[in-house]
């Protein structure tokens, strides 16, 4: 799963790596969303995911990785339960200008005992914090990876997914990592 707050780059992340044209369920943002959906520094954002994004990567003939992106607005969180069922893990995308938007996302995956990693998608006009500052702000254990990722760049997204798969293996091999610290 690829998750995070509203407008952090989840759709872009999936689009950068998917070997198929990603399935996106975007709708135009309207005046009704003013005050509910805050695009922050992304004032140019005109569409939003309303159900899910879907992409696919074939790792080899017998292993295909399916990517499901969650909608970022709180009013669509009820859809997440269907998406998390059977998920190996989650990439939680963070925008440093709105770190607080990822707290409910962290809680969700911790409550569902889903291994996850944190990736900071750097926006040009967002405040810069080093990864240790992000870890501290989120109250994360040392064994949870916090990485930089450019959601537009295929290699950056690929490295992120490798880190997620490593975290999934760690989670399965060491039960203590299943406990929230």
Where are these regions (language model features)?
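Conserved G1/Walker A P-loop phosphate-binding module
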Residues: 1-42, 56-66
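N-terminal first-folded block
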Residues: 43-46, 52-55, 90
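Short secondary-structure boundary/capping elements
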Residues: 49, 71-76, 97-101, 129
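Conserved beta-strand segments of the P-loop GTPase G domain that flank and frequently precede/overlap
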Residues: 67-70, 90-95, 118-122, 148-150
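Inter-motif core of Ras-like GTPase G domains
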Residues: 73-97, 107-112
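Conserved C-terminal guanine-recognition region of P-loop GTPase G domains, centered on the G4
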Residues: 93-143
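Canonical P-loop GTPase G-domain recognition
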Residues: 124-181
